[in-house]
Each structure stands twice: as structure tokens, then as C-alpha cells.
Amino acid sequence: MTASTSSIRKAVVLVLLAGATACGGSFYEVPVETPLQPKLDVSGFQRVLVAGFVSGGSDEVDTNLETARLLRRPLRSNSEFQVIDADVLELTSVAEEQSAGRPEFEALGGNGDNGADAANGDEEEGGERYSEDDLEILEHIFANASYWQEIGEEYQQPLIVTGTVYFTPHQRSGMVTRQREVYDEFGRRRVAPLRAYRDRRGYVLSPKFIFIDGRTGATLYTERHREEVLYDASRNTPALSSYFELMDRLIPSFLSTLSAETIKGTRMLLK
């Protein structure tokens, strides 16, 4: 629905309500709940294994370990799954081993040390493990059904959550609008927009969540996300804090893939 269509509908509702009130009618609110089914049918699974992730970008955060940890927590409290408590797989190393000898992987030098941010050209002190494009070369591990079937057999054939995670510093410069308090000659306060050129720095988080059937090793569903956060260049925000902030935005969408949701609202009815 476009913004203009939504505005028209709201205007029509207000006109109808005004007309009903003028004619002596009245209206009242009733609660409404809209159920939303999960994106993936997981009725055949009772257990879930957040196995690990192929990671790239900055090495300031162990995104493999932290992503697995942050996804397990809401699954325990907001789903009916039995979450398997297992060591997180070093999936980047496994993907590298399975990629050995492939021309496209050997072209990377076999170690992913590119030393530059492919997204914006920023150079970081510690370099970059793998760029976002490099991670695609390692994604063939998710098509290795026998590998995932073996993992599934080890953990009683659960639903397996895996994928890739790319987390990297990011910067952008440009005009930004801020609100500023001003007072006129009579002392009256008002808020005025102020546009200024600012350098901003932050991080980009781009995970791809892949859901695999532990019984067959086949991929059931893939979901990609991308979030970024920017701060004033003068603000020193730790990488881990930014990572947590970005993951908080993604987790609700991740959970909606596996669990039913209910959207609550109200509806106006005429008597």
C-alpha cells in the first residue's frame, strides 16, 4: 500500500466517523489479533542446531561465535524447539578445507586476507578476512548435503541453522538534518531543522541465514538481511556494541521464519 493510498483511506474513515457522529451514531474500539504463519514449515522438527557461520569482514568481533550465541538465546525463550547446546563449528575453516584446489578460491590466496573494505574502500588496521563477494565463493559448503547429513546424524537429525555473516566498518559523509531549539525575541521556543555536513562512521552487518534439513542435508530456506548503523565521526562506539545493536534489529525477522506471530491492533466499529 502506498503512502498516498493509506492517507486517502484514513481520510475516508475520518469523514465516515464524523458523519456517523453528526447523525447521532457512536463508535467503539474492539481489539483485533491477526495471526501470521511462519515462513518455513518446521512441523517435522523438535530440535534445532545453530551450527555456526562462515564469517567475513572485520576481525574486531568473532561473528561466528556471537551470532550463534545471540540466535540460540531467543530460540530458547520464544520457540517450542529444543535448542541443542553444542560447540559452535569453525565453519570458515571447514569451508576453506572443502574449497582447497578450487581455482576461484586459490585466486583469493587461500587465506581471505584482502586488507580492504570492498563496500567503501576503507582500509582497516587488521585488514579484512573475506569480503562480501569472497564469502559467495565459500558458500558451496551449504550445497554439500553429505556433510550436513553427517552433522544431522550426530545431533539426532535436527533443523540446522547456518549461513554467512559479514560485519565491517563503514563510513559515509554528507548532509544530515537535525532538530535545533531556537527562541524568538519574545522568548517563545520553537524547533527548527538544521542541515549540516557531517562525517559519520559505523558498521554494516549482512548475514545470510540458511536452514538445512538435518535428515537429508538439503537446504530448506535461505534469508538474507542487511543493516547498517552510522554515528558521528567523533563518537567512539565499540564494534561489539554496534554488532549487538544491528543483531537486535534482525532477530525478530529471524524468529518469524520459524515461529508463528500475532499482530495486535484495534478496529473502530459503529453502533
Each model region followed by its residue ranges:
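A generic structural signal for short, solvent-exposed coil/turn residues
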Residues: 12-15, 40-42, 75, 197
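C-terminal/domain-edge helix-coil "capping" segments
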Residues: 23-46, 151-155, 167-271
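Low-complexity, intrinsically disordered/propeptide-like segments
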Residues: 17-20, 43, 68
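N-terminal segment of the mature soluble domain
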Residues: 47-169, 214, 218, 222, ...
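Short alpha-helical segments and helix-capping/turn motifs at coil-helix boundaries
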Residues: 6-7, 33-35, 145-147
